[in-house]
Amino acid sequence: MTQEVRAAGAVLWRLAGRVTEVALVHRPRYGDWSLPKGKLDPGETIAEAAVREVREETGFTAILGRYLARTAYPVPSRTGSGTVPKTVDYFAAEAVSGEFAANDEVDELRWLEPAAAEKVLTRPEDVRVLRAFCELPVGLTTVLLVRHAKAGKRDDWSGDDDLRPLSEAGQRQAAALRRVLALFGPDRVLAAPRLRCVQTVHGVAEDFAAEVRHEPLFSEEGYWPDPVLGVARLLAVAGDGGTPVVCSQGGVIPDLVSALADRDGVELPAARGRAVPSKKGSFWVLSFRPPTAEEAPLLLAADYHPSALPAPSPSRS
């Protein structure tokens, strides 16, 4: 059986004054210039691997943004017979701290403007990823829209449904979300006033000593009397800047994401039955252009992550 090699990486960027620069690394083993990337460790998600590999190869701590692309190409099999497919998933990632030090894998790092970087990159696949990065500006606002984790069956719960807690499986999902959402640099946490929603993201808030703020418009009962108000509320949250986490319900998220995408002309990833996906424990990374004096935030990209547990790459808009 052919075993696919999974890897992840990032277009690591920074601002030098008003100029965007991206990091390229030189690997002496291969004699090439590439984007930082590497194989997934066992039990690791692509997001976790991307951040770890950036840190190991460049010395920089990074905050993830939008998903960019997947590349695929054959590599020699470990058995020495033939090749196996290798896939690499890439994110945009902002460098927030660190310093490069040469190591066995990478002996040089260059910060270049994208046009110059494109001429230096060795592999055409890396050029394609860099061009995907350049399709949108940097400095976007990220909203992490989460569906609550598993909470058992409603029919099996005899109490107030608002107080239905996470199941054991849901607790595992929440723990995974805590790890993965942290990679995007969240700075506040909002949730529909349902225990299962609050429990799903409580750990995220706890990591930066914050409280989970209740948002009734993101519950099913609060959203559906007037969905326009719910959309406006999410835009207001995005307009406040930073990186908010918003935990909502399965009866809200598909309509909310669809409404934003229709409003701003963003094509959503295809799903089974063409419904907007929203599995329990999944999340959307919504990338907005910040508001101006005349305009509200504008949705520019929407990436769906079906799970914070090790899983396939997200679907890209």
Question: What spans do the regions from the language model cover?
Answer:
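Nudix hydrolase/Nudix homology domain
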Residues: G31-D32, G98-K153, D162
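N-terminal strand-loop-strand
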Residues: M1-L35, V143-H148
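Active-site-proximal alpha-helix that buttresses catalytic centers in soluble enzyme cores
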Residues: G38, G139-P225, P254, R263-D264, ...
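Conserved Nudix-box catalytic region and its N-terminal flanking loop in Nudix hydrolases
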Residues: R18-T61, W157-R164
